[in-house]
């Protein structure tokens, strides 16, 4: 008595089709599918943004020292 049989669900489906029509149900389905697709793309974008960028390479002091030496030589 607690669950409905297949015939109950078919009658409910027929009433829904008669009330709303197939065109509105099709539009509702495509709108719902688009919303789910947009949500999934939004979640995928959020995951890509949350990944940290790779660490930058450290600059050695040698190149800075050579630049200073070059500037000192041009001043003399």
From Swiss-Prot:
One of its GO terms (molecular function) is protein transmembrane transporter activity. GO terms for biological process: protein transport by the Tat complex. It is found in: Cell inner membrane. It holds the Pfam family TatA_B_E. Residues 41-76 are annotated as: Disordered. The keyword Ubl conjugation does not apply. The chain crosses the membrane at residues 1-21. InterPro entries: TatA/B/E, TatA/E. Keywords: Cell inner membrane, Cell membrane, Membrane, Protein transport, Translocation, Transmembrane, Transmembrane helix, Transport. Signal peptide: none annotated. The keyword Transmembrane helix applies. It comes from the Bacteria. Residues 64-76 have a biased composition (Basic and acidic residues). One of its GO terms (cellular component) is TAT protein transport complex. It is a single-pass membrane protein. Belongs to the TatA/E family. Part of the twin-arginine translocation (Tat) system that transports large folded proteins containing a characteristic twin-arginine motif in their signal peptide across membranes. TatA could form the protein-conducting channel of the Tat system. This is Sec-independent protein translocase protein TatA. It comes from Nitrosomonas europaea (strain ATCC 19718 / CIP 103999 / KCTC 2705 / NBRC 14298). The gene is tatA.
């Amino acid at each position: 008595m607690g669950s409905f049989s297949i015939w109950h669900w078919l009658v409910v489906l027929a009433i829904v089709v008669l009330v709303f029509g197939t065109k509105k149900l099709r539009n509702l389905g495509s709108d719902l599918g688009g919303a789910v697709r947009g949500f999934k793309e939004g979640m995928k974008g959020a995951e890509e943004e949350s990944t940290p960028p790779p660490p930058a390479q450290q600059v050695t002091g040698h190149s800075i020292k050579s630049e200073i030496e070059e500037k000192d030589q041009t001043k003399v």
